[in-house]
Amino acid sequence: MKRALLITLLLAACTSGPPPPAALDTKNESCAWCRMAISEARFAGQVVATSEEPRFFDDIGCLAHFLAGKARTAGTVAYVADHRTRTWVRADAAVYTEVAALATPMGSHLIAHADAASRDADPDAKGGRPRTAADVFGSGSAPGDGQ
């Protein structure tokens, strides 16, 4: 019985797809890039990799700096928080807006949303300039699972 359970768990771990986002504790996490405390989840990002601790970021700009020039490896996924709902969204699939009038933790002025409907429902995104993942993260874009 124990052996069957162990085999099932191992198979599930191998075939479960990209790693899911980790829970963010804004009372205890600091940015992996600038080392500032992460106080506002709506601006946060993270990188999760198989067999590694998640890395959190206080601003999408910090996430972009961290990823610049890094090789995209299998089992690594970047996530950003939907600014309106605070749910995690794959960074390579998010809709970005640059809002010059909006103060973000490190001044990138970038916010992310799961889709255009979430962006359109967010008053903070009004008047902002649409951006793509390639605009934010460069031609390699944000890592998806192995991308």
Ranges and model annotations:
Residues P20-K27:
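Short, flexible, mixed-charge glycine/proline-rich loop motifs
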Residues K27-H65, G69:
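Post-signal-peptide N-terminal segment of Sec-exported extracytoplasmic proteins
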Residues T76-Q147:
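Thiol/selenol-based redox catalytic cores and closely related redox-interacting motifs
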Residues L10-A13:
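C-terminal motif of bacterial Sec signal peptides marking the signal peptidase cleavage site
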Residues F56-V89:
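Mature extracytoplasmic domains of secretory-pathway proteins
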Residues T15-G17:
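Bacterial signal peptide processing site
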Residues K2-T8:
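Sec-dependent signal peptide recognition
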